[in-house]
Amino acid sequence: MANYFNTLNLRQQLAQLGKCRFMGRDEFADGASYLQGKKVVIVGCGAQGLNQGLNMRDSGLDISYALRKEAIAEKRASWRKATENGFKVGTYEELIPQADLVVNLTPDKQHSDVVRTVQPLMKDGAALGYSHGFNIVEVGEQIRKDITVVMVAPKCPGTEVREEYKRGFGVPTLIAVHPENDPKGEGMAIAKAWAAATGGHRAGVLESSFVAEVKSDLMGEQTILCGMLQAGSLLCFDKLVEEGTDPAYAEKLIQFGWETITEALKQGGITLMMDRLSNPAKLRAYALSEQLKEIMAPLFQKHMDDIISGEFSSGMMADWANDDKKLLTWREETGKTAFETAPQYEGKIGEQEYFDKGVLMIAMVKAGVELAFETMVDSGIIEESAYYESLHELPLIANTIARKRLYEMNVVISDTAEYGNYLFSYACVPLLKPFMAELQPGDLGKAIPEGAVDNAQLHDVNEAIRSHAIEQVGKKLRGYMTDMKRIAVAG
């Protein structure tokens, strides 16, 4: 099979990369009615599989789970989760032939095997759903022409999808129809009903494409969402300890610092995050972020180039075929780092202390968010898509580090995200070491003293922060998410 994106001509590539439309709430007036009375079979009962299924059932849909015979016979975790929540469970052969919509929510590396197994069992005219388009775009999976192929991609982990639904809300969601597989022209109706059934329409839905979702998702997770947080954690911890900070305190400042800092980001964008600093600290954080952007821009561009060309995907799939040798080696090495093995700090760190002593961390967040956003937009991805794949998801990933450091982040994210994270962080850490060596007192671990600032300089910096394109689009999109709960509880 050939990478689907690479089979398109340039005009088609640009059209699909640039497909992005914020949908009005009135477009979801019918809710999930298009799928009511139809059979929806979910393959996979992980975090997305279970929680989307719970929401869809609560929205009045007929949901069951198709699992492998071995998973049922051995009563594995997927079988237990589905049955304990009262769902009908059966084998592929028992459930797939009756399904009107088969939703594939297994991990990326299992998609080809799953799709090749279920396709012959699917009835004529059925629909196949994904929550990530890697299998279609990067693997180039060929789907029977009578089958409609759609995507509903919540921009949150599965647990958040469920919790926001239970609160009567939802999470921002991308939906798409594969242009090669919409024989009856009903793909958008199916995708809208599925999104409404998960609650996504209450938080904002973007009509996107499989291509735009995949390319932007890969870029975000590799760079700012995971790679930058991992590289920043390792670099900042080593710098603090090198300068005599208690390793336990240093570890806590970083582990919970990302979460606390990005909670401000979630509520009010880069503007609010920077406003939490004193004026002298804000000017310093801005200067550091500009230096970081200049240093890291080529690395961000390389990741985007490799994602667009398919180089990243082909390398990762080669590692799949080699039993994940690179992935598992990098995972083991990360677990042995000084940050991951540092003792726990039992003392209290106040919320403002994370900002005052984390000026460099704030600069890293600002630089990483803006670079990821700018690089995606420069590659043809529309601003709304770039926002969701950079700034929006960052607090959610930071929250995983607050739970169990980098180990938890890498367990929770997909193997695809984890592989890309290691590629980025392994390149970024040595790239930034000369920069780290030139830091000044107050950049990390100590507060910058209050003092006089130049009013004109402060005015210009504030204008530069607020006028960035990500702040403009973010203000609009956050207007649809005002009811989402706080994530951070600083340690």
UniProtKB/Swiss-Prot annotation:
Coiled coil (residue ranges): none
Domain of life: Bacteria
Cofactor annotation remark: Binds 2 magnesium ions per subunit.
Entry's EC annotation: 1.1.1.86
The UniProt record lists the keyword Repressor: no
Protein family per UniProt: Belongs to the ketol-acid reductoisomerase family.
Stated name of the protein: Ketol-acid reductoisomerase (NADP(+))
Native source species: Shigella dysenteriae serotype 1 (strain Sd197)
Annotated gene: ilvC
